[in-house]
């Protein structure tokens, strides 16, 4: 019976983890995530007010989501709209992973407000186009 393992207490992995933590602290990455994450949520809440197919917006830091629904009262998921918004935004240069009726976002932790706004502008344009296609506007 061995008292050690290949994955526990690996000095190289520990050094890499410590170096990563030091960079996060020195470059104030968490502060950026808090500030820009709050900006994301502010913008997304405004989008929710202005778009009939946005049922809800959720997020903390840089883990964000926009829920697309057919009706805000019933909250019926709108998968078709999610697919089209994803495709339109991707064609405009926004790279992300489709997730049905949830527009899921997890940008790099170093993203600033300018790039956040660029991405949200693309998403909002794409949502507006999809709403027109489905007769919501």
Each predicted region: which residue ranges?
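Conserved N-terminal phosphate-binding loop of PLP-dependent enzymes in the Aspartate aminotransferase
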Residues: 1-137
